[in-house]
A protein has these predicted regions:
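N-terminal segment of the mature soluble domain
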Residues: 40-92
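C-terminal motif of bacterial Sec signal peptides marking the signal peptidase cleavage site
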Residues: 14-17
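A short, structured loop/turn motif at beta-sheet edges
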Residues: 35-38, 72-77, 129-137
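Surface-exposed short loop/turn segments
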Residues: 83-138, 144
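Sec-dependent N-terminal signal peptides
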Residues: 6-10
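C-terminal/domain-edge helix-coil "capping" segments
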Residues: 19-31, 116-124, 131-139, 144-184
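N-terminal post-signal-peptidase region of extra-cytosolic proteins
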Residues: 27-28, 63-68, 112-113
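Positively charged n-region of N-terminal signal peptides that target proteins for export
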Residues: 1-4
Length: 184
């Protein structure tokens, strides 16, 4: 009898894990940017949001920026952070390029943008970093499939999505060194 309960429990766990879909996470950045000069940031306004997703995402971004040593300032930030919540299918032309840390630390003049078309379903969260002085987009990270109806959304789901996006941004604020999360 115990074997039947154990087998049933294993089947339930296996079926519930099928309910969680993998998110597609990627990023794009500007080759013309000196990422090592930024220390501070502030947010641009989010779209009007009645579901509190916007505030959850902003809080998650704030945590990720703090973990990388960036400071929020009201006046004269180096970076402006923007984020978009897209609930529909997204089709756009993007670029294949070397990883950001490789570009910053090991510039190779032969590295070039290679265009490619992207088609994403299930909605998307898009995080953009802009140079505050020029308003130029310097980095954009995204996760698609975020609003797919089959995705199981546990507590802190959006925090996890934003963390996965920022895993694509391995840089720290000017003068900062990587440190453990406990030090925050």
């Amino acid at each position: 009898m115990k074997k039947i309960y154990l087998f049933s429990a294993l089947i339930i766990v296996a079926l519930s894990s099928c309910n969680t879909l993998k998110l597609m996470v990627d990023n794009d950045y500007s080759y013309e940017t000196d990422f090592t000069k930024y220390k501070t940031y502030n947010f641009l306004n989010c779209e009007i949001d009645t579901s509190f997703v916007c505030s959850e995402i902003q809080d998650a971004i704030r945590r990720q920026m703090k973990a990388r040593g960036y400071k929020v300032v009201a006046d004269g930030p180096g970076l402006l952070v923007s984020y978009s919540i897209i609930r529909d299918r997204v089709d756009y032309k993007g670029y294949f390029q070397p990883s950001l840390d490789r570009w910053v630390n090991h510039f190779d003049g032969d590295d070039t943008y290679k265009t490619q078309n992207f088609h994403f379903g299930g909605g998307m969260i898009l995080v953009s970093l802009l140079d505050a002085e020029s308003s130029r987009l310097i980095w954009r990270g995204y996760a698609s499939g975020v609003f797919n109806k089959q995705v199981n959304k546990p507590i802190n789901y959006y925090r996890s999505v934003v963390r996965n996006i920022f895993d694509q941004y391995p840089l720290f604020a000017a003068g900062e060194k990587p440190r453990k999360i406990e030090e925050l």
